[in-house]
Amino acid sequence: MTVSRKPSKPEINPEEIEVILATDCGSTTSKARFFKKLGNEYRFVASGEAPTTVEAPFEDVTLGVRNAVREVEELTGHKMLAPHGIITPSKGEKEGVDLYVTTSSAGGGLQMMVAGVVKTMTAESAERAALGAGAIVMDLMAVNDGRRPYQKIERIRHLRPDMILMAGGTDGGNVTHVVETAELIDAAKPKPRLGIDFELPIVFAGNKEARIPVERILNEAYALKVVDNIRPILEFENTDPARNVIHELFMEHVMSHAPGYDKLMKWTPIPIMPTPAGEGRMFQTIAKTYNANVIGVGLGGATTNVYSTYENKFVRTVSANLGMSYSICNVLKEAGTKNIVRWVPFDIEEEDLRNRLYNKMIRPTTIPQTVKDLVVEHAVAREALRLGFEHHKLLARPLRGVQRRRTIADIFEQEAFEETYIDMLNVNWLAGTGGLLSHAPRRAQSALMLIDGFQPEGVTNLAQDSVFMMPHLGVLSTVHPKAAMEIFEKDCLVRIGTCIAPRGVGKEGEVMKVVVRMPDNSLLEEQVGFGSVKKIALKEGEKAEMEIFPFRGGDVGRGSGKARKVVVEGGVVGTILDARGRPLVLPDDDNERKQKLIEWFKALDAYPERLYELCGR
């Protein structure tokens, strides 16, 4: 058994770094981003992308990385590749880089199983810790999860996780259930997903009184690491020690056995970071920089990651079955055909929809060829975002077990779920990253996807990753925070605009009114009827004073029906007045629904006129 220490960073002098290469090995695409010091600041220069090559027939992640970097070389004339890998340090103006860093979610990313004593307490805290480390949680096992021991043993054997995180018990409490969990894991004799000959890493972050018996059971056959208890007392959750050691073990035991990663690890002096961990760092940066409550999303090919920093509490969740390429058919299964079709403004047969999505699943690197294909893909994205956020809210909630004094029997019977602590009226920023959002042909399309998927309320700043570089900057920030922050502010974060959306439902004929003091000091009055949207052209970098008068019963943050004065910031789309109500409900009548969708699309200039011609509108 080893008691974990936080791994030390390699000695890198930021003052000597002028040329930086960062890559992300995604489930579908490997993405290279080239940064350079221009004058006194670091800027984004060029990008390259290529299909990821972690699966057969290639089974070597470095081939995809090389292809992506080669595209950057062709665009810039800057040579970076050599037979041994990346040329470091830089040699003159046009050869080599001073720093190479990378993130990865290829090959399934980091797949973990978590275990605790009580499903809604220590097991849930363990799940938050694993998700915060960038893992996909394959299963959550608890004493009171309703499964018999033999069922749990079969499940552990079948899953073959990369790592197990085991929690349970407060410090000084009963050790019986914790020991039983360790015995159950040992009885299953789990084998790791990659590299059958190496020891499966197990992190124990439970009752410190149980360390010795857990060591006796697990130390011989597994790579056991012990860290501080995740829930030392019921009122406190301590996930950082577990998260840090998960990162360490991810490199040491998991990445080293994935196809080609042994080579990739030698190319970079910085530990490879899971893609979601990199994204999460940058969403936390937004929250810290603007002292704000932030919800972020990474919409990937295999997963949908949702991040929230709300009143200084950071939570990440991953919906491992919701993605836009490999997992697109799971979105269809989870959401249902009807929920996807409701966002499509033209007639489409269910069989046609299924066939389109099946083709995307088996050809994950393809992109939409027609505007109708694009609209269908965006409809699926809305549902992936909605479902991912619903999942997120199940974990973004108060700690369980601290509300009142209760017996252990009461705790085991506790099944009622408290609602999330996230109040959308208090969310200041909604931001997105991931290929589909970053590469949407028009920013208004990504704005609508974010608004329809998350349904922000009140006054919310909208932003997105310009060309998908948040993961790259996240790993860069661990060694060169100045460079990461400069690039993030100047080249990464695109301000889409501000969404004004009252909570509540109005009636036909009611209006939301705004009075705006524009940047040129002119006064603008706008009205938008309930069920409609409208755009005010407020450019990026511009600010305006606005007084909002919601429709009757609507709440924009000051109470039902009350006006609110705010300063709004512009963006590439502008200020979006969304009077469709919350929750957002589409008309039941098919023709009325299609008409509404087209009305909303036109109001924001989201799609080309060709779409409306094809829809006969």
Language-model segments: residues:
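Nucleotide/phosphate-binding catalytic cleft detector across ATP-hydrolyzing
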Residues: 1-22, 35-43, 49-293, 373-382, ...
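An acidic- and aromatic-residue-enriched active-site/binding cleft used to recognize and process polar
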Residues: 26, 142-143, 169, 207, ...
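Mobile, glycine-rich extracellular loop/lid and propeptide segments
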Residues: 27-32
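Glycine-rich phosphate-binding loop of actin/hexokinase-like ATP-binding domains
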Residues: 34, 41-53, 281-354, 441-464
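Short, well-ordered loop/turn and helix-capping segments at boundaries between secondary-structure elements
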Residues: 312, 324, 328, 346, ...
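Basic, amphipathic N-terminal segments
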Residues: 335-339, 354-362, 366, 376, ...
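Charged, amphipathic alpha-helical linkers/stalks
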Residues: 339-360, 481-487, 498, 509
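Conserved nucleotide-sensing/catalytic segment adjacent to the nucleotide-binding pocket
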Residues: 368-372
